[in-house]
Swiss-Prot record:
PROSITE patterns reported for this sequence: PROKAR_LIPOPROTEIN (PS51257)
Protein name stated in the entry: Uncharacterized protein MPN_407
InterPro entries, A to Z: Ester_Hydrolysis_Enzymes, SGNH_hydro, SGNH_hydro_sf
Cellular component aspect of the GO annotation: membrane
UniProt keyword Disulfide bond present: no
Organism: Mycoplasma pneumoniae (strain ATCC 29342 / M129 / Subtype 1) (Mycoplasmoides pneumoniae)
GO molecular function, one term: lysophospholipase activity
Gene3D superfamilies reported in the protein's UniProt record: SGNH hydrolase (3.40.50.1110)
Amino acid sequence: MKKRTKYRYWLNSLAFFGCGVSVGAFFTLFLMGTQSDVSPLFVKNINIQLPSSTHQQKIEPLNLPTNISKTEIASWGSEFQSKVLDFYARDGEEHDNKIRYQLPSLSFAWTGGKELVSDFARLHGARNFVAYFDQYWRFWSNPNWPAGQVDRVDVLCEWNSDKQTISDINFSDQFVFASARFEGKIANFGFAGQTMKDINESFQERVLSIYKPRTLVYLTSQADAERVDYYEEFVNNLTALIKKQVGEKAEKDNFFILQLHWKTNDSAFNEKLSVLNFVALATVKQLTDQNRNFASKIKVVDHFEGDFVPSDWLSGNYLSEDKVSLSLQGEFAIGKQLAQVLKATGAEPLPVEVTEPSLEAIPINEETQFDVKNYYSFGHYHDTNVINDRIDFDDPNYNLETDFFNNAKANLVTTSNPFTVTWKTKTKELEIESTEVNPNGLQYQLSFASDFNARDIKKRPTSYLRWNGTITNKQIDISLYWKYIHKALDIKENEPLNYLLQITRTDGQGSYQVINGWINKEKDNTPTIFDFLKDKTQANWLFIGDSMTHGVGTDGYSSAPQLLEQSLKNDFGRYRDVVINSAINGSNTSLELYMQNHRFKQYKNIDVYVLNLGTNDINQLAQGVYTVEQYKHNLTQILDLLHTQSPQAHVVLANIAPSSLLRSSEKNWKTFNDFLEGIPKDSNYSSFVHLLDQKSLFLQLAKVSGIDINENKLFNTDFLKKSFYFADKFSHLSVNGNVEYMRNILTTVGFDWQNSAFASLGYLSFGYLKKPATVVELPEVTVDDQTGVLDIKQSVPPKLKVNKQGFEPVFITFTNTNNNEQVTVVLNNWSQWETHKTDFAPWLKCKHWNIDVKQIRRVKTTFRDQENANFFELIESKQ
């Protein structure tokens, strides 16, 4: 006897099969169906209420097919498997007597409703399922690749050439291509309220006018499910959309993926979803019955009740408080399900915890102020206001104004105000100039505080800030990144700009001078990219770059392009904007030019390019591969091509951020950056090229990290370690580095993001940690050789228990001894491992791993008292 089929969707079977079918006949059909894989799939699920008569009346006249089997659905999309997943299928094209290898287009376009939007309140800047799939698609290896193939081929020697080494080859004549898995480009066209009718009618304008995606993905959405009077229109529009993507007769070499919406904890909404999912599947079945070519071009991913859906989906932690939206864990699970269904047959599933962030909130407030110098980067949202001196705002007897003036007037020296303080609107910086020259080169320490006469400190504590700067001979070195100053002072056009300037001489003579000064506001009327965008309903953004933009080092969190997309849609109401990241790990200017048709020329009607190339060029320059002049030629050629392709577009051109990769090439780094910084000033480019100044950004970030540094020391190991903006042995930007990268883009474009959700986004994780002064009891770590199950046993001393002042996350890092591949699991506590250890067992059993278990505890600290923090690092390592 065949295994009984589990029926997953429901419909009023009597009404659907027609009123002429008797009850007895129906049950005969039903019982026969339970024994066959070709039985009707859509029958009543006893756990869900029957659909309303409205649904029945609307669906029945459509005459949609009902005999859809799970086996048949699984067989759809066969060409997707062979053509899209065959990463090494390349066509050779003769070019200048050489063979130019053309990679297949692996581009995806997602469309649907609000389910595709990463709202900040729910995800806190972390990835949604589309971005998780992007990570799998572009970073994780495919075991079906031919044996002996490497993940990446940087150089393929010239056709019929006897040159053997990289240095023998003229770089412009190289055959350079990245491993195809990195070439997957994913764009998200979803926005809240968008229906299938909207998608179909705007498909040419919103999608095809930009580029032609190899694969179009549609997720059945709430916007469509809620419209019970809509089914015939839905079928017609879905049919038309599929044909636009794969061809009227499925003749195009394109694909369509149908995602069926996940089950929710809202039974009434589940009823609507079930009907919509049925209609969508039946529409596909109708097309495949008419023309079998469609069956090879359409793939279905059933998140509603597919075999791969976790059994605890409704009872687990996959849904948000609204019972419908995905939680962070749910987003990860849906991304994983996509990867499982769409990957090559036999591919290893992504271990469930590998890149899943933990966003459990830590109470961050004045009572538990933490030291941001030691904590960064692992999934905790916090306010990054800097308060150098601890202030008890809750003390009813505390008066900030009195405290400030009592200190300031202690040794008051009366003097005229020698300083002019100007707020620079464009750069959002305070410019301080002195009318006097200090002949002795004495230094002055400055502090600002608001005039609180009309303010209530308890309502606006962030409007107070003490920060220090040093003045020597008219020049000021401000030791705090301007974003904090702006956030704290909160300077607005309609707000009084009367601030108190406190000056302290370092020689101890004339200890305090208090000057009741005015901050001037400089009006900047220079047109910005923001002015260009504000009248556009939809703006199209294209990132071109290397691993810094690709997202290497984010460990499952959002890269700068993904954060920008979230910010545009959440903070600025630009929910129709499209952000495409074409950046490729390892790319350089020669590679971009060589692959221009695939990298950037295929994208049309781009409004803003973000161009960030140079790190790998510098490294290859150091190897003697090519010259500075060739880099300059390549870069300007790319700019010319972009401008020719989209004359109306603006280019945000980044200079090169510091990285441990460039430690031996500092001279070249300065040469490249001098060249890049001069391009926006060149009359040939000044009208459309805008500098994204990463060098200045990281100099300021070093200062806010408490590191006294200048341009010549940006490659200092201490800075790369302590600044908490780098990952991957300090060669790439960490998740916090990507946040700053994104903020810098917003600033350059002209968005005022200071009061947005992203203004205070930051993450906590391992930083530059000192060895623990306290020894904790080591846990016992064992791995069962037969099952692969890893057990951790630990008796936690009472003093280490979690309390309101700290937390004890557990980090388990697995390092593959064959290829040094590393994955990290983040647990909230030791016992949490019990829930997941069996998921990892098959994975651990078949590979050779070194296992490091780490625990860190944060306690109450302040900026000035860093030694109060107790860190517990490596506990045990076991092979």
